[in-house]
């Protein structure tokens, strides 16, 4: 690139001669330098030199003379857009616009040009020397590092973001230099908070990058210089989109530090004196930092360990910084708390931690959801907080798990986590069981009435039939009316179910198997009613289909009995998995071989059969004798081969007997021998594979029945049947009484002995002010009003808060951890033991 300079034509005749050298950056490396010639520039001493806009702009040529024999010299060329020189004729000064370069005097140091590429290259290589002249350049050109010409045009990346992405051994010396330059050009806040502007990384700032690079020094430096700790990175890469690469962390710097397991940065962001982060801040979908931690959980052991640890630390730190803030009760835009979000996404490890969290520190004990009532050896009686769990609250954990999609991972296993397992059992034992058995009895009575009404239907004439004044007709009409009323009940119940649950097509036949069958039963019955009053005898066909489905739906009520319920689940799974696949392959074989056989058969070759000039291949085309020249009859005959009742010589009306026999033998081998035996093998494998899964599915089905029964109650009735008891378990941070709706569960833990973990009663088993045997304690798996009468935990709290925690005694034998609920038969071990609490 050639550099040019313009020189004032009205200069003095004897200007000083000076030697100038070209800036090496302005010389083309591929061009050859011609022999230097002596030259002289006439420049005014009072001329001010300023930098121009770009090297690419066209410049006016400079005037120079070359004298042979003088020493060769190269001019130093700098950019100037305005040259001011004194002119006696024009007044005090005369200003002239220059397009490219001006020539400095020998007393001034030449300045270097900078563009985006040169700055990016310098910061990427951690080269501070190349940026020595950046500040004078910006000051003289009145530009800032945040100007558009210094940003990546596609992503909006600045030189600070470029430097953050190019750390050398965890540091880049140009970062502090760039921040100092931005401070001196009055653009520090804008510069340090500049973010990506493209749709993929939109919103990511230097602070996000420093946290992602796990660099505490840079995080501190950025926050000290005014970095926004609430900046949200909401580009496509930071959203949770299925099938697309990315990492969702909650958009905010605090959430990023938490989701990448950086507790030191989390504490710094919350406790720094420059700009503390808001612990309750939400992202674009309403998630707080606790929601973000739940989102990044993946149910692996290492991940669950760090997520639960970070969750606990943030919860405790938030309670200390903001004592009155109920961080765990904040909901996102879907109305989910972190607990409900863990349930809806199948994060069973995080769910179990939140439900069973017990914090022994007195100042943070109000964060506990589990309180140890008493402990005796391995036996623990625990009180579980039912807030956000029971169905009395919106988006409760029980409803979220029971009514979630079948694609939710660990859906069946989550109901086995305490206190959910015991809570559902308590509801079933106290009231749902009786209501369910009553409904079962009513349905059996309904089906008997429906069957009798269908069996004794009139057969003479066309419907509707007139009622005769006989006792039998009165009973028949009454049965028909009751049957139709039941059909309307199942129809509207199905409509209500589909409107409330809105199951997807993919999960419709998995989660809504029974509901679909009841709904189809009602449709057949109502269609039969319409045909009956339309004077059509075809009403009988719809009625018998409804009758058959009605008795089949009796399997729905087997979920009230464990063994029959598990058996019904296995039948359902085999129908939906093995039998559906078998039927698809079998129908393909049946249709294919039927079309081949029916094409081969010709009835006209048999004189006993009437000759038909035009063959109709349909179910209605039958001669006086058996004719297999139709697809319908041939399919029926081939079906007999499937069940082993076929005859290879069921007809003689065909040509090419060898071909006919080969077709039949191939069909028998593929269906009767191969497909049927494969179906039997698959069913046996399915039974072995889903034995335990079927039990969990049965528990889920029973849980859905329990919740449906509760939802059918009025609000006043729900409160009357609510499990647990309202108790004062301590004090809130502001000194008020802390009341919780608690549910008691007796557990056995062979690794944690009688240690002071929170609230422990001195007299184990003495929760009512009266003595009770250990066997009763073991059998009492639920909380009733009688158990909780005149019982409060406030005295225990006051006593526990004044004592220091005792260190756990070393165990003599290291046993494998076991945590579960005591069964009634376990009490036999303690038959001869002294009653706890007695002297």
Swiss-Prot record:
Resiniferatoxin binds at residues 513-514, 552, 559. Residues 92-105 have a biased composition (Polar residues). GO terms for biological process: behavioral response to pain; calcium ion import across plasma membrane; calcium ion transmembrane transport; cellular response to acidic pH; cellular response to alkaloid; cellular response to ATP; cellular response to heat; detection of chemical stimulus involved in sensory perception of pain. Na(+) 1 binds at residue 644. The chain crosses the membrane at residues 434-455, 473-497, 511-532, 536-556, 560-598, 657-683. Belongs to the transient receptor (TC 1.A.4) family. TrpV subfamily. TRPV1 sub-subfamily. This is Transient receptor potential cation channel subfamily V member 1. It comes from Cavia porcellus. The lineage of its organism: Eukaryota, Metazoa, Chordata, Craniata, Vertebrata. The gene is Trpv1.
């Amino acid at each position: 690139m050639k550099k040019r300079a313009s020189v004032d034509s009205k200069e003095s005749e004897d200007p000083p001669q000076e030697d100038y050298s070209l800036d090496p950056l302005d010389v083309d490396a591929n061009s050859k330098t011609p022999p230097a010639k002596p030259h002289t520039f006439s420049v005014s001493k009072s001329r001010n030199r300023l930098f121009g806009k770009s090297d690419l702009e066209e410049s006016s040529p400079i005037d120079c003379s070359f004298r042979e024999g003088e020493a060769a010299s190269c001019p130093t060329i700098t950019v100037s857009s305005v040259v001011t020189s004194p002119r006696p004729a024009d007044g005090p000064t005369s200003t002239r616009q220059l397009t490219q370069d001006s020539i400095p005097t020998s007393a001034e140091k030449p300045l270097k040009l900078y563009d985006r590429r040169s700055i990016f290259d310098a910061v990427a290589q951690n080269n501070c020397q190349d940026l020595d002249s950046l500040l004078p350049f910006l000051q003289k050109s009145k530009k800032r590092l945040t100007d558009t010409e210094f940003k990546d045009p596609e992503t909006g990346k600045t030189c600070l973001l470029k430097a953050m992405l190019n750390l050398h051994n965890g540091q880049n010396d140009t970062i502090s230099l760039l921040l100092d330059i931005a401070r001196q050009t009055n653009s520090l806040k804008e510069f340090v908070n500049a973010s990506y502007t493209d749709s993929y990384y939109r919103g990511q700032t230097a602070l996000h990058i420093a946290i992602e690079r796990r660099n505490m020094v840079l995080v501190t430096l950025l926050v000290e210089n005014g970095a926004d700790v609430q900046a949200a990175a909401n580009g496509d890469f930071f959203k949770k989109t299925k099938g697309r690469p990315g990492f969702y962390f909650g958009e905010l710097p605090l959430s990023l530090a938490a989701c990448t397991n950086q507790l030191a940065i989390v504490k710094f962001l919350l406790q720094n004196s420059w700009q503390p982060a808001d612990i309750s801040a939400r992202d674009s979908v309403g998630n707080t930092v606790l929601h973000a931690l739940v989102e990044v959980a993946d149910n692996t052991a290492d991940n669950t360990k760090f997520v639960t640890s970070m969750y606990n630390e943030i919860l405790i730190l938030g309670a200390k910084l903001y004592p009155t803030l109920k961080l765990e009760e904040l909901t996102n835009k879907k109305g989910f708390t972190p607990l409900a979000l863990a349930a809806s996404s199948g994060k069973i490890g995080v769910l179990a931690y939140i439900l069973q969290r017990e914090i022994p520190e007195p100042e943070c004990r109000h964060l506990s959801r589990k309180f140890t009532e008493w402990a005796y050896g391995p036996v623990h009686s625990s009180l579980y907080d039912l807030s956000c769990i029971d169905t009395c609250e919106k988006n409760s954990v029980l409803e979220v798990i029971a009514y979630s999609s079948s694609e939710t991972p660990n859906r069946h296993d989550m109901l086995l986590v305490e206190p959910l397992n015991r809570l559902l059992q308590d509801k079933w034992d106290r009231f749902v069981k009786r209501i369910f058995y009553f409904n079962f009895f009513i349905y059996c009575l309904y089906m008997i009435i429906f069957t009798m009404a269908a069996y004794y239907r009139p057969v003479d004439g066309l419907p509707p039939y007139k009622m005769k004044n006989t006792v039998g007709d009165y009973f028949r009409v009454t049965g028909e009316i009751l049957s139709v009323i039941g059909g309307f009940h199942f129809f509207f119940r199905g409509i209500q179910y589909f409107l409330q649950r809105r199951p997807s097509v993919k999960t419709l036949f998995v989660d809504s198997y029974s509901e679909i069958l009841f709904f189809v039963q009602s449709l057949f019955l109502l269609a039969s009613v319409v045909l009956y009053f339309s004077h059509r005898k075809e009403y009988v066909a719809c009625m018998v289909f409804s009758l058959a489905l009605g008795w089949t739906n009796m399997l729905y009520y087997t979920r009230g009995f464990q063994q029959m319920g598990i058996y019904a689940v296995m039948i359902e799974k085999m129908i939906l998995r093995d039998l559906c696949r078998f039927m698809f392959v079998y129908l393909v074989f049946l249709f294919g071989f039927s079309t081949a056989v029916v094409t081969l058969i010709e009835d006209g070759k048999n004189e006993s059969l009437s000759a038909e000039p035009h063959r109709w291949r349909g179910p209605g085309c039958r001669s006086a004798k058996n004719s297999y020249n139709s697809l319908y009859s041939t399919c029926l005959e081939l079906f007999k081969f499937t069940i082993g009742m076929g005859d290879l010589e069921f007809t003689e009306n065909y040509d090419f007997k060898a071909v006919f026999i080969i077709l039949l033998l191939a069909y028998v081998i593929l269906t009767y021998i191969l497909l049927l035996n494969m179906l039997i093998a698959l069913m046996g494998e399915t039974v072995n594979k889903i034995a335990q899964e079927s039990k969990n599915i049965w528990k889920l089905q029973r849980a859905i029945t329990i919740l449906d029964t509760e939802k059918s109650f009025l609000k006043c009735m729900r409160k009357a049947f609510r499990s647990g008891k309202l108790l004062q378990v301590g004090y809130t941070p502001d000194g008020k009484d802390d009341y919780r709706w608690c549910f008691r569960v007796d557990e056995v833990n062979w690794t944690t002995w009688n240690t002071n973990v929170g609230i422990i009663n001195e007299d184990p088993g003495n929760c009512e002010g009266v003595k009770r045997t250990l066997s009763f304690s073991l059998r009492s798996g639920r909380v009733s009003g009688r158990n909780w009468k005149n019982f409060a935990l406030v005295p225990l709290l006051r006593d526990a808060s004044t004592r220091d925690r005792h260190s756990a005694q070393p165990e003599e034998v290291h046993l494998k951890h076991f945590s579960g609920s005591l069964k009634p038969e376990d009490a036999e071990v303690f038959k001869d033991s002294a009653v706890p609490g007695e002297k």
